[in-house]
Amino acid sequence: MAGSISCHHGERATEPENPGNVDDNKETGDEKPDGEAGAGNDVVILFTNDLHSQIEPIGKDATYNPDKGGVARIKVLVDSVRAAEKAVIVADAGDFVQGTYYFTCLGGDVEMMVQKEIGYDVRTIGNHEFDKKIPGLKHMLSLNEVTTVSSNYDFSRTVLSNEVKESAIIEAGGHKIGFIGLGVRLSGLVAPNACEDVDYSLPLNKADKIAKELKDNGAEMVIALSHLGYNSDVTFPYYDSGVAAQTENIDFIIGGHTHTFMMKEQYVENEAGNAVPIVQTGSKGIYLGYMKIHLDKVGKQRFSYRLIPVDSRLDSRIDPAFASKLAYYSEKLEQSMSEVLGYCSSTLRKGSPQGTLGNWATDSMVEMCEDVFGVTPDLAVCNNGGLRAEISNGDVTRSDIYAVFPFDNKMTLLELTGTSLLKFFDSMAVNTEPLSAGVRLVIKDGAVKSVSVGGKAIDPKAKYKICTIDYLVESGRYSLDENTSRQDSAEYIYDLFCDHVKKITARGGSLQADIDDRVTVL
């Protein structure tokens, strides 16, 4: 990389989740280049991360960022920049899929078409790219010719050995830009059977070595597409800041995974004394990342970065041919997804240590367990990370339920000893997940002060029936893998919840939940 960027501290990134409504932007959507159009030494990188299958704009009634995002709008911006600049590369930092019924029902076909039509050049693999397991990921990657880089996941023992590259050099406007891909640790995050035979290496064991090889092979700079997540602690090697600080051949990091809205780049000084900018767009395509780099004399004044809002100001310029392709898929799903299943009396939301959505979900799982397995469990638990949307007040459609529960999880009935159940609650005191109403858990200073199930203290020698999801068992979390017996449902959890909502409606009820005393933090 010619020259270096002077080190300074950018503005602090916003919170990774629920950032609130993005500010309205008065631009017209004609994204003009910074400086002279088509300057020969300029390269523009446009990027996304954590799109999570947000094909359509976020709903107009959503609590956060209503009517923001939408891939047709992103294409307007990309086309506009390409028309103004000679050297443009479009990249994605992982989790392009999973989060709406498009992926749940169609397995990535829509998202891969989107990447092809927008013209993505390079991408890396996030944890949710594994959600349809290795055969599903192979199917997705075969649907377009976007270069896939993953430097610390070794796919050589899988059917993806030819589809995923350790690194790549992308040429744009006569310049050679190197790309590496860095992925988060899979253990405990991705079910073992979803990433079978994928070998993980610590990012620092691969990143700098591969970046240097790219430069030795002619790359003028190296950009890491990272799905590690942002954390300001430069001593921690599992996040972007730590990787930047403990390497010397990575020049820029485009991040993901933590859904961090970084309105200003964050600079970290690397081992060579140069400042490495770290950037990230947040999630769901609310913004398109724009980064322009001047390759002749790279310094703070010649590096520019901003997040371009993806909103309704772009609607008049949407490509009709692309819109038609999107409509093909939406119409394919509309009839089943628009089915009204029931009514929600008041909006159900996630929360900690309790939320109305989690309380409703786990209380429902107790009843659903009776329907599926013929057994009333002692308690139910799900994970906050598996609840991907709120349920708004009003009619509840199949698409609403699929938005909350998009994963191909099965309902699971376990039997645990009281000893294992006590260990489970020790974990809940540190990382509280939604629990059903029969639990009374009191937490103080990150530890269990008291706990009971069904109004009784837990007997270490007794056995307890737990209703949960297969993901929590297979990920090895919370001692659930210590079960003495296990049954899995035949149907996926989202279909079971749809049936349950219909059952609530049939008996004249509605979706509702309150915050109660099942979990108390002193």
Which residues fall in each region the model found?
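Bacterial Sec-dependent N-terminal signal peptides
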Residues: 3-39
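Short, compositionally biased low-complexity segments
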Residues: 48, 184, 331-343, 395-400, ...
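Hard-cation-handling environments
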Residues: 311-396
